[in-house]
A protein has these predicted regions:
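N-terminal beta-loop-helix "entrance" segment that forms/cooperates
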Residues: 39-57
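Helix-loop-strand module that forms the ligand-binding subsite of alpha/beta enzymes
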Residues: 56-123
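Cofactor-binding loop segments of dinucleotide-utilizing enzymes, especially the Rossmann-like FAD-
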Residues: 8-9, 39, 123
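N-terminal beta1-alpha1 ligand-phosphate binding loop
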Residues: 1-32
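N-terminal glycine-rich anion-binding loops that anchor highly charged ligand groups
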Residues: 33-38
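Short, glycine/charged-enriched secondary-structure capping and boundary segments
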Residues: 18-21, 49-52, 89-93
């Protein structure tokens, strides 16, 4: 299974998306395949135990969870917003680490190597 990449920004000219693209190209030159998890295709609700208890794990969350679990690794482009991880990325990782029974389950991240990248602008 190819590597899965996530970028914590939806901005079209995101520096972090550019950084992840460079990483993906470098890995491709070494023979590693990767695929980007696009936010437009995820459609995840804001994490809530109320939603989880009443409606179960959203299909998009289960799909992301399965993709991460099956992947050979994870590439995360993580911008910093006011010193924190972006809510979009945190929400996706929160849903991806919940099991169908509504419990925390970090197993999708257990056996996969992960690379965290961040673009930093120095003024």
């Amino acid at each position: 299974m190819p590597l899965i990449s996530l970028v914590g920004s939806q901005r079209p000219d995101s520096f972090n998306a550019s950084a992840v693209t460079l990483i993906e190209r470098a890995l491709k030159s070494l023979g590693a395949a990767s695929e980007r998890a696009e936010w437009a295709n995820l459609a995840l609700p804001l994490y809530s135990q109320v939603i989880e208890l009443e409606q179960g794990l959203p299909k998009a969350a289960g799909d992301l969870r399965s993709r991460i679990k099956a992947a050979d690794g994870l590439i995360i482009g993580c911008p910093e917003y006011n010193g924190f991880m972006p809510p979009l990325l945190l929400n996706a990782l929160t849903w991806a680490t919940r099991n169908p029974r509504g419990h925390p389950d970090l197993s999708p991240l257990d056996s996969s190597p992960a690379l965290f990248a961040r673009a930093v602008l120095v003024a």
